[in-house]
Amino acid sequence: MSIRLIAVLSAASIAVTSATPVADSSCTISSFDQVASVLAECTDIVVSNLEVPAGETLNLETKKKGVTITFEGKTTFAYKEWTGPLLRVKGKAITVVGAKGSVLDGQGQLYWDGKGGNGGIKKPKFFKIKATEGSHFKNINLLNCPVQVHSIDHSGPLTLSGWNIDVSQGDKDALGHNTDGFDINTTDQLTIEDTVVKNQDDCIAVNQGTNFLFNNLDCSGGHGLSLSVGTSHEIIKNTVRNVTFSNSVVRKSRNGIHIKTTYQFRGRYPWRMLTYSNIAMEGIWKYAVNVEQDYKKGKPTGIPVGNIPIKGLHLEKVTGTLTGEESTPVYIICADGACSNFNWSGVSFEGASHASNCSYVPTGYSC
């Protein structure tokens, strides 16, 4: 072989080597000081057995489109009294995956004092997502979240599937509080499916948005499947439309279904196209279905106000059992003319201590 040919081949080899993608090991985050460089260089990222320092946010915000992030092993967030969030993920068309056996541990047991976000120890919120363009988060396991677990904001289209949120240790001595599973704002086209939530507050809390599907959820210990609107001074943020809960179970919870409007501010549009289909309940101790237009500053007043009308609440095959001295199957308190087009079928409950109480009676149900 001529010296010239050897030189050509060597140059080609160097060119191929320089074009080779960054090695997998260089795209693994196992130390907090690697986060920024890995996000800047990689599109297939692994977070492996990471310990996040106290008072720091694991900020996985990427400007690249189509990035994949995989959590392996145990990601632990060190204790500090602060507001958080512990974890932030933002991106377009991103995929976030929990590998088999992985867990994100918020160490909530170090914070819980029975007061949640209402006082006592300052507690960090856990997980904040802003994801668009068909992003998918799947098989994520969250353990012992200090306070509100998960916030979805300015997102969609977005799918979350196969999640497991376990804050059940907070049940002991009623120390866990305000541990909402998913709080959702300013989002369009969201699906959450095949997910388990064990907590002490709302399993799902929809505050604003359109075109939501929640399917095959298993919720226990909290406040049920909730819609809560009216707390923002921005009218558009008090809008909810086209929301479906289906094929889900609510166990050992304060409420099964909770729909409430707050009358500090007005909504632009009435709530429409709200559907609960094939919902089973077990051990509900307050209300199986609770619709209230009387909330102010986080509490019911007994005086309903029609600032945000509810026009269209469809319940189909919603059944279950209640328990305890406070239990009531259905409680509806609506302002005059502010509730309409409630069409229910196959709605029945057993074991309640009190009869249903409705200021507006749905078609297909007897209060």
UniProtKB/Swiss-Prot annotation:
The active site is at residues 201, 223. It is an enzyme of class 3 (hydrolase). It is found in: Secreted; Secreted, Cell wall. Keywords: Cell wall, Cell wall biogenesis/degradation, Cleavage on pair of basic residues, Digestion, Disulfide bond, Glycoprotein, Glycosidase, Hydrolase, Repeat, Secreted, Signal, Zymogen. It comes from the Eukaryota. GO terms for molecular function: polygalacturonase activity. Disulfide bonds join 27-42, 203-219, 334-339, 358-367. It catalyses: (1,4-alpha-D-galacturonosyl)n+m + H2O = (1,4-alpha-D-galacturonosyl)n + (1,4-alpha-D-galacturonosyl)m. PbH1 repeats lie at residues 187-208, 240-261. It holds the Pfam family Glyco_hydro_28. Expressed in larval carcasses and gut, and adult gut. Glycans are attached at residues 185, 242, 343, 357. Its EC number is 3.2.1.15. Residues 1-19 form the signal peptide. PANTHER family: ENDOPOLYGALACTURONASE D-RELATED (PTHR31884:SF9), POLYGALACTURONASE (PTHR31884). Belongs to the glycosyl hydrolase 28 family. This is Polygalacturonase. The lineage of its organism: Eukaryota, Metazoa, Ecdysozoa, Arthropoda, Hexapoda.
